[in-house]
């Protein structure tokens, strides 16, 4: 089975329309078992032809999926609770601390599932959140 992760800043501009709102965008995909199958090679070639975009083949797509989920689950959980955009988490300590706690909890869940996430994932994701351009979220 092939898994994939898309990294993009986007919004739903209107029904059935996803708008890329800024910043880089890329896609990472790979076999869940880490193999480089013929099917994955064909998909990679077809994807590049069909989209004009070069995808990234990962031998550890489960890690990629979890590392994105660590950030998304933390930021979306906190912003849903406070009913404010992403930037509010970095502007107010009472929002930032639960965000960091959520990152740590999601990281721990990945580790409990046997996924090898980067050792400094919490620091990487907090730096990413701090560095976001306000127009990108």
Language model segments and positions:
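Alpha-helix boundary/capping residues
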Residues: 8, 47-50, 128-132
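Internal alpha-helical scaffold of NAD(P)-dependent oxidoreductase catalytic cores
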Residues: 14-120
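C-terminal active-site/capping subdomain that shapes the small-molecule cofactor and substrate pocket
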Residues: 110-137
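Rossmann-like NAD(P)(H) cofactor-binding subdomain of soluble oxidoreductases
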Residues: 1-17
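Short amphipathic alpha-helical interaction/hinge segments
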Residues: 12, 81-82, 133, 137
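Residue-level "edge-of-site" marker
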Residues: 7, 61, 123
């Amino acid at each position: 089975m092939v898994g994939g992760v898309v990294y993009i800043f986007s919004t739903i501009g209107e029904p059935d329309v996803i708008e890329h709102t800024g910043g880089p965008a890329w896609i990472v995909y790979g076999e869940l078992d880490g193999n480089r199958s013929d099917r994955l090679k064909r998909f990679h070639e077809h994807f590049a032809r069909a989209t004009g975009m070069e995808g990234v083949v990962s031998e550890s797509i489960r890690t990629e999926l979890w590392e994105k989920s660590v950030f998304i689950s933390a930021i979306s959980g906190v912003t849903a609770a406070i009913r404010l955009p992403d930037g509010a988490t970095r502007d107010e300590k009472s929002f930032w601390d639960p965000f960091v706690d959520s990152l740590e909890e999601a990281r721990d869940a990945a580790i409990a599932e046997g996924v090898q996430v980067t050792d400094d994932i919490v620091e990487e994701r907090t730096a990413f959140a701090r560095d976001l351009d306000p127009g990108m979220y």
